[in-house]
Amino acid sequence: MRGQGRKESLSESRDLDGSYDQLTGHPPGPSKKALKQRFLKLLPCCGPQALPSVSETLAAPASLRPHRPRPLDPDSVEDEFELSTVCHRPEGLEQLQEQTKFTRRELQVLYRGFKNECPSGIVNEENFKQIYSQFFPQGDSSNYATFLFNAFDTNHDGSVSFEDFVAGLSVILRGTIDDRLSWAFNLYDLNKDGCITKEEMLDIMKSIYDMMGKYTYPALREEAPREHVESFFQKMDRNKDGVVTIEEFIESCQQDENIMRSMQLFDNVI
């Protein structure tokens, strides 16, 4: 059951590779190894020393690895006190195990990393923007971070809790292809009315190009975002009614090999 004040998750550096260009407009990006390293920087607690399941060959550089965190034990006096000091107390591990596709051990490690970044137990939009901007210092990621935050904050209360974080992370990392595509659709559906308009997609495209900064400018022509939106709709809007529904979105993505390949980038990150 969802606890009071609960929303839906933080996380995912949407820095996919060039094969995802058909869907997001990203210019050619890092390899899966580089993506994984960036993801591990977002959550230092997910380094190989914390999660034994992480492949050593894809681990973050040693300089990025913090000390190995002590597992969270909800039955210990110390951790009980630690949990009592945060503004938002997370649901029990057993309940989160049932709601996500993470093991108890993974949830323990994720909680410690989340609390290190967000001692109060929740993160608001401004803090989220600050965290996200670290990964795109060459550009302006604020608009894209807002869209991403709203996708995680599904109850629209202006904050993301640990439960939200792991719920979204579970979809991104462990969800089925349909689950991931549905999550992506929700990200692009800015007003959450069940369809994507050209105006919404243009806002997304502009925010992506702004975020990538010097990796797209000055080579990027001013009209490039709008041209990409037209290409997107020509591909996705099957019945030509001017909007893209979730059914059209998922069907079109599933028929695109490049998009399907890019959806595998987060497999086995942790």
From Swiss-Prot:
InterPro entries according to UniProt: EF-hand-dom_pair, EF_Hand_1_Ca_BS, EF_hand_dom, Recoverin
Tissues where the protein occurs: Expressed in heart, brain and lung. In brain, abundantly expressed in striatum, hippocampus and olfactory bulb, moderately expressed in cerebral cortex and lowly expressed in thalamus and hypothalamus. Isoform 1 is predominant in cerebral cortex, striatum and hippocampus. Isoform 1, isoform 2 and isoform 3 are equally expressed in olfactory bulb. Iisoform 3 is expressed at high levels and isoform 1 at low levels in heart (in PubMed:11263977).
GO biological process: action potential; clustering of voltage-gated potassium channels; membrane repolarization; muscle contraction; positive regulation of potassium ion export across plasma membrane; regulation of membrane repolarization; regulation of potassium ion export across plasma membrane; regulation of potassium ion transmembrane transport
Annotated region (Interaction with KCND2), positions in chain: 257-270
Organism: Rattus norvegicus (Rat)
UniProt entry keywords in alphabetical sequence: Calcium, Cell membrane, Ion channel, Ion transport, Lipoprotein, Membrane, Metal-binding, Palmitate, Phosphoprotein, Potassium, Potassium channel, Potassium transport, Repeat, Transport, Voltage-gated channel
In-chain residues carrying the UniProt-annotated modification Phosphoserine: S9
Known role: Regulatory subunit of Kv4/D (Shal)-type voltage-gated rapidly inactivating A-type potassium channels. Modulates channel density, inactivation kinetics and rate of recovery from inactivation in a calcium-dependent and isoform-specific manner. Involved in KCND2 and KCND3 trafficking to the cell surface. Essential for the expression of I(To) currents in the heart. Required for normal protein levels of KCND2 in the heart ventricle.
Subunit and interaction comment: Component of heteromultimeric potassium channels. Identified in potassium channel complexes containing KCND1, KCND2, KCND3, KCNIP1, KCNIP2, KCNIP3, KCNIP4, DPP6 and DPP10. The KCND2-KCNIP2 channel complex contains four KCND2 and four KCNIP2 subunits. Interacts with KCND2. Probably part of a complex consisting of KCNIP1, KCNIP2 isoform 3 and KCND2. At least isoform 2 and isoform 3 can self-associate to form homodimers and homotetramers. Isoform 3 interacts with KCNIP1 in a calcium-dependent manner.
Bias-annotated ranges (Basic and acidic residues): 1-17
First-listed, main subcellular location of the protein, grouped into a coarse class: membrane
Regions annotated as coiled coil: none
Localization (cell): Cell membrane
Gene3D superfamilies cross-referenced by the UniProt entry: EF-hand
Annotated binding of Ca(2+) 1, by residue: D153, N155, D157, S159, D164
Keyword Ion transport: yes
Molecular-function GO terms, alphabetical: A-type (transient outward) potassium channel activity; calcium ion binding; potassium channel regulator activity; protein-containing complex binding; transmembrane transporter binding
Entry annotated with the keyword Cell membrane: yes
Family: Belongs to the recoverin family.
Record PTM text: Palmitoylated. Palmitoylation enhances association with the plasma membrane.
Protein name in UniProt: A-type potassium channel modulatory protein KCNIP2
One GO CC term on file: Kv4.2-KChIP2 channel complex
Record-linked SUPFAM superfamilies: EF-hand
Covalent lipidation (S-palmitoyl cysteine), chain numbering: C45, C46
Residues that bind Ca(2+) 2: D189, N191, D193, C195, E200
Highest rank taxon of the organism: Eukaryota
